[in-house]
């Protein structure tokens, strides 16, 4: 369901609100706290925020339909194909920035990105590492990724998460993806 409020895509603001919730639990951490490992593959807080930032950037440049997306996708595939880890590739994009500076860079970018997605045609097809998807699905996927990776941060900090109604975007994309898996595999 595409929700347009005041000619803007609501899913973009739901993404931003999810990011803001994550930012609020991290904004008072010290530099060394970002090296704390999570239960997800031992990723540190730096790894998680760097991952979210890099793939937000990827989704955002896919809106432009230009060479920037192609160059990014080719770089990612080349790095991962040559044995680099996901985190190693992502650190080349974030230029090794860590801690509160990385958190600030992530927030500034997702805030600006929200506005670009909010005014984009929700049905426009954008590139991704797999099949193309709609703008609405792209920003919903970024929301889902943020929500999912945030859980490892909440768990590591010993915090209980309070989910908001915006979780419906994640439920919808999960349901659509589930059906899509059967379609792709012809089952």
PLM segments and residue spans:
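An N-terminal domain-cap segment
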Residues: 2-46, 50
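Alpha-helical transition-metal enzyme core signature, strongest for iron centers
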Residues: 15-22, 45-59, 79-93, 99, ...
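Structured surface interface patches that mediate subunit assembly and partner/cofactor docking
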Residues: 1-13, 64-77, 95-100, 104, ...
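Helix-loop segments that flank and shape redox-cofactor active sites
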Residues: 23-44, 65, 69, 115-133
């Amino acid at each position: 369901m595409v929700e347009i409020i005041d000619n803007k895509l609501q899913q973009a603001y739901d993404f931003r609100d999810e990011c803001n919730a994550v930012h609020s639990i991290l904004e008072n951490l010290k530099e060394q706290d970002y090296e704390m490992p999570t239960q997800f593959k031992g990723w540190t807080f730096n790894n998680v925020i760097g991952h979210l930032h890099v793939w937000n950037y990827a989704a955002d440049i896919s809106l432009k339909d230009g060479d920037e997306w192609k160059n990014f996708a080719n770089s990612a595939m080349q790095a991962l194909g040559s044995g680099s880890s996901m985190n190693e590739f992502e650190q080349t994009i974030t230029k090794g920035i860590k801690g509160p500076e990385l958190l600030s860079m992530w927030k500034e970018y997702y805030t600006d990105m929200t506005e670009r997605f909010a005014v984009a045609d929700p049905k426009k097809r954008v590139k991704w590492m797999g099949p193309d998807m709609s703008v609405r699905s792209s920003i919903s996927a970024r929301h889902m990724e943020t929500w999912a990776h945030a859980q490892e941060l909440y768990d590591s900090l010993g915090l209980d998460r309070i989910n908001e109604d915006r979780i419906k975007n994640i439920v919808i994309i999960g349901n659509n993806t589930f059906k899509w898996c059967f379609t792709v595999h012809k089952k």
